[in-house]
UniProtKB/Swiss-Prot annotation:
InterPro entries: NifH/chlL_CS, NifH/frxC, P-loop_NTPase, Protochlorophyllide_ATP-bd
Gene name as annotated: bchL
Record-given protein name: Light-independent protochlorophyllide reductase iron-sulfur ATP-binding protein
Cofactor: [4Fe-4S] cluster
Reactions catalysed, as given in the entry: chlorophyllide a + oxidized 2[4Fe-4S]-[ferredoxin] + 2 ADP + 2 phosphate = protochlorophyllide a + reduced 2[4Fe-4S]-[ferredoxin] + 2 ATP + 2 H2O
Organism: Chlorobium phaeovibrioides (strain DSM 265 / 1930) (Prosthecochloris vibrioformis (strain DSM 265))
Subunit structure, interactors included: Homodimer. Protochlorophyllide reductase is composed of three subunits; BchL, BchN and BchB.
Amino acid sequence: MSLVLAVYGKGGIGKSTTSANISAALALKGAKVLQIGCDPKHDSTFPITGKLQKTVIEALEEVDFHHEELTAEDVIETGFAGIDGLEAGGPPAGSGCGGYVVGESVTLLQELGLYDKYDVILFDVLGDVVCGGFSAPLNYADYAIIIATNDFDSIFAANRLCMAIQQKSVRYKVKLAGIVANRVDYTTGGGTNMLDQFAEKVGTRLLAKVPYHELIRKSRFAGKTLFAMEDTPGKDECLVPYNEIAETLMQENTPASIPEPIGDREIFEIVGGWQ
């Protein structure tokens, strides 16, 4: 039975880079991993495969949306450390529903029988809008993980994600494993002071603190995971949080909780006092 992870976060905060490095850390510890990009940008697996691969929606268009005509090879690319990548894709700009495409991708995974092939399945999901389609991975996930930075907009999005996780937990097994603090900068960004308080308030924890480092940014543009980059000063330090996350997730009983989110209006008042 696969361990299913749903990684969410506000767009533009390094969610896909973090997801790819978590997948890499898990794979290097012996897990067979499938990473599924659930964002219309369809670049989640770029650091793993080194290219923008064909999306599920593109493959479906080629067979006039007859799911039964597709095979795993039509939509999956294998990359770094044997990680398999799949991209849901999205409709043309200005038309259709990206969440619907995510739902279609989940259906395809079931039809292809892929849930039993992997040790870990990681959904990398757009977290700005948690509509029915984009929340679909929570129906299958053992654990949700939120990627966030130490600022109000990111925390507001994280709080909305906590609402979705809380709601889904009523009918499904999903729990929140924790928050990954990304781009942590103690010189200008306040470290994790706001995230620490938010995590305590909603009843979760910080899984790890990923430092703000130029090497991580460069790895993204190079189409590589951080693990695949040449050894340079700072690399070992940057790898630590990804390995910590992988070790935590591979425990037999990963600590997790059902979050208690803050009300939309209340969060403006509360977070304002954390500056």
